[in-house]
Amino acid sequence: MKRLMISAMASGSGKTVLTCGLLAALTARGHAAQALKCGPDYIDPMFHEKVLGVPSRNLDLFLQGEDGVRRTLLKQKGDYVVVEGAMGFYDGVNGTDRASAWQVARTASLPVVLAIRPGGSSLTLAAQVKGLLTVRAASQIRRLILTACRPALYAHLAPILEQETGLPVLGYLPP
């Protein structure tokens, strides 16, 4: 079973749209996919369920602990498991990284695709990504994808991000 996490720098970055789009694409290609959501969120899993037709579960380190998260992940059936992060990648309980998407990714050894909603920056955006790569050990971030991005902006930003961060940019989702 292949698995990955979709996370972001902050809420409102397009994680749910990206996750649902990926789930729909996998299903359309004949793959059995399962979705999970970090934390105690019960709204986003309803979107996952709508796309897949099967329930989506939560991975919640605060409530389940590390063993519970690993057990939940191992129980999933199918070819792919897509885990959607919550809030910003390092945002956990009470302003700490405890029970954050980063901690879930680290606990479950999940590679992370970071969804980035570009604003009015380019090199500064690369600096923010580099900060995410280094603020904690073993960030698990392996790929980038731009969300709410126009083709011309993608053509400008992708090479900058790849050169400055060393991470491949997979593509973009239009606004």
Task: Put a short name on every predicted segment.
Residues 2-108, 116-143, 151-155, 162:
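ATP-dependent carboxylate-amine ligase catalytic core
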Residues 112-115, 170-171:
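Short hydrophobic alpha-helical runs that function as membrane-insertion/retention elements
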Residues 145-149, 173-174:
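Short, structured patches in soluble enzyme cores that scaffold and shape functional sites
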Residues 166-175:
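Beta-strand-loop-alpha "switch" segments that mediate conformational coupling across diverse proteins
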